[in-house]
Curated annotation (Swiss-Prot):
Gene: minC
Pfam families with a match to the protein in the record: MinC_C, MinC_N_1
Top-level division of the source organism's lineage: Bacteria
InterPro entries in the cross-refs: CAP/MinC_C, MinC, MinC_C_sf, MinC_N_1, Septum_form_inhib_MinC_C
Summary of subunit composition and partner proteins: Interacts with MinD and FtsZ.
UniProt-listed Gene3D superfamilies: 2.160.20.70, 3.30.160.540
Record-stated family: Belongs to the MinC family.
Role of this protein: Cell division inhibitor that blocks the formation of polar Z ring septums. Rapidly oscillates between the poles of the cell to destabilize FtsZ filaments that have formed before they mature into polar Z rings. Prevents FtsZ polymerization.
Protein's UniProt name: Probable septum site-determining protein MinC
Alphabetic keyword roster: Cell cycle, Cell division, Septation
Length: 225
């Protein structure tokens, strides 16, 4: 008969596996019994961090608290995290939004801030004082004179593509690159360029075709909004 609760050592440390076929009350009972049996071999060191693997199910906050309490009160272990093979509706919604390409055909004027959860394609210009914030990549088919912030929530793998003109600024995650020096002031036109964070953690401006080599997954993007 397969046990509903098992404690195993893994590459990432100690894990407690809770069967997704058992009810929460069955898991609580078996977990309490298993930990009680292990008290026969007491451990006197610091509390050990464990991961709790719950399989193809989700626990409510109350259920997580109940399991945590049992482990805390009956062992020298403390939970670092609960891990599930499935995601909540909110997580699924956010994942889908971040996987989409949002597109607009307009001019982003001074004072305007456009923010999207996924990748963003703009057909038009970004004027000085205008700003785009995207959790993913940003592609602008037009002149950039405002602020472009890709990887807004911290993704340093994001890229920006467009015509970078004075006094634009590119931000990728927490990195910043400015086109506000005198060298850029007299540039009236330019080709499309790409901006990305290199292995040294710095934003690099390079030819547009380099994107495919630096971020090959971008060539597989599909979709729209």
């Amino acid at each position: 008969m397969k046990k509903n609760v098992q404690i195993k050592g893994t590459k990432s440390g100690i894990s407690i596996f809770l069967s997704d076929k058992a009810s929460i009350s069955e898991l609580q009972q078996e977990l309490s019994q298993l930990l009680a049996d292990q008290k026969q071999n007491p451990y006197s060191g610091e509390k050990l961090e464990v991961q709790v693997q719950i399989g193809n199910r989700l626990f409510s906050e109350e259920e997580e608290r109940e399991i945590s309490t049992i482990i805390h009160n009956n062992s020298q272990m403390k939970i670092s995290a609960f891990y599930s093979n499935v995601m909540s509706k909110d997580e699924a919604k956010k994942w889908k939004e971040n996987d989409q390409i949002f597109s607009m055909a307009t001019i982003i004027r001074s004072g305007q801030v456009v923010q999207v959860p996924g990748d963003f394609l703009l057909i038009g210009d970004v004027n000085p004082g205008g700003q785009i914030r995207s959790n993913g990549n940003v592609f602008v088919l037009g002149n950039i004179k405002g602020i472009i912030h890709a990887g807004f929530e911290g993704d340093e793998n994001a890229v920006v593509a467009g015509k970078f003109l004075y006094p634009s600024q590119v931000r990728i995650a927490g990195k910043v690159y400015g086109f506000d020096s005198e060298d850029y002031k007299e540039v009236a036109d330019t080709d499309l360029f790409s901006a990305f964070v290199n292995d040294a953690g710095e934003i690099v401006i390079d030819e547009i075709h380099k994107i495919r080599k630096i971020r090959p997954e971008i060539s597989n993007f599909q979709g729209g909004r």
